[in-house]
From Swiss-Prot:
Family indicated by similarity: Belongs to the UPF0145 family.
Coiled-coil region: none
HAMAP family named among the record's database cross-references: UPF0145 (MF_00338)
Pfam families assigned: YbjQ_1
SUPFAM superfamilies, alphabetized: YbjQ-like (SSF117782)
InterPro entries: UPF0145_dom_sf, UPF0145_YbjQ-like
Protein known as: UPF0145 protein BC_5181
Highest taxon, organism lineage: Bacteria
Amino acid sequence: MIVTTTSTIQGKEIIDYVDIVNGEAIMGANIVRDLFASVRDVVGGRSGAYESKLKEARDIAMEEMKTLARQKNANAIVGIDVDYEVVREGMLMVAVSGTAVRI
C-alpha cells in the first residue's frame, strides 16, 4: 500500500476517493525506567528510550490506518498527517490520518 503525505501520487491517477482513515496508539511510559534511560541515553539532546517509544507508537498507528483503508478496499492513502500528544504524564499518543483512495 502506498502511503504519502502529498495529495497526489506521482505517475498514478487517483480513481476514487474512498474515505478518511485514521489510527491511534497510546503508549504508557515507565517513569523510573525512563528517568534512568534519559540519563543514560541523552546525547546531543536526544533520548533513545523516548525515540523508541515514539517509533513504536507511530508504527502501530500507521498499521491501524492501513488496515482500515484495506477494509474499505482502498490501495493507497494520501495526505497523511502525524500528530504527537502527551495525554497525561507518562502517556504518549500518536494519531495519524489520511484519505484512503483507489489508484
